[in-house]
Amino acid sequence: IYACEFFYDEEGLACWPKLDVNFTNKTQFVYRINKGVLDVSDDKTLNDSMPDDSKRIPFTNMIYVGDGLSDVPCMKMMRTYGGQAIAVYQEENRQGVEDLLSKGRVDFIFPADYREGTALDSTVKNIIRKMAICDTLAEENAAQFRQIGRSPLPYQASLFEET
């Protein structure tokens, strides 16, 4: 989870923003998580080409929860690369997130209620279970291919990817 970081004085009091993530660099931070390049000064590694199987956190194992228009590019990116996007809202903003859902920019919309037992909580837990099942099936499939001395077929992996 990225948001911001503060510079603290010797007494442990926050005295100045050290890092903030705004609408213009949110997608960059999603790529940083994807590639495992968390050093914000390391743009070279971030922009280097990297094979998908070397990426630390695949998009298919990401859930992006956003609450505003500044999150739409990341939500769209999540959906494009196989992750999940959830828009949360205050009741007065429901129409806007309904539009995101109807245009395929998000997978789900929920009130911004993060408490245990809410529809948002249940759905996030179900998505995580789905991700775990897909990973388990892909590992079993790859193990069986290894047992017969072969590599998985190119299309085989897609059978277990989230859509």
Regions found by a protein language model. Give the residues of each.
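C-terminal cap/substrate-recognition subdomain and adjoining C-terminal extension
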Residues: 1-163
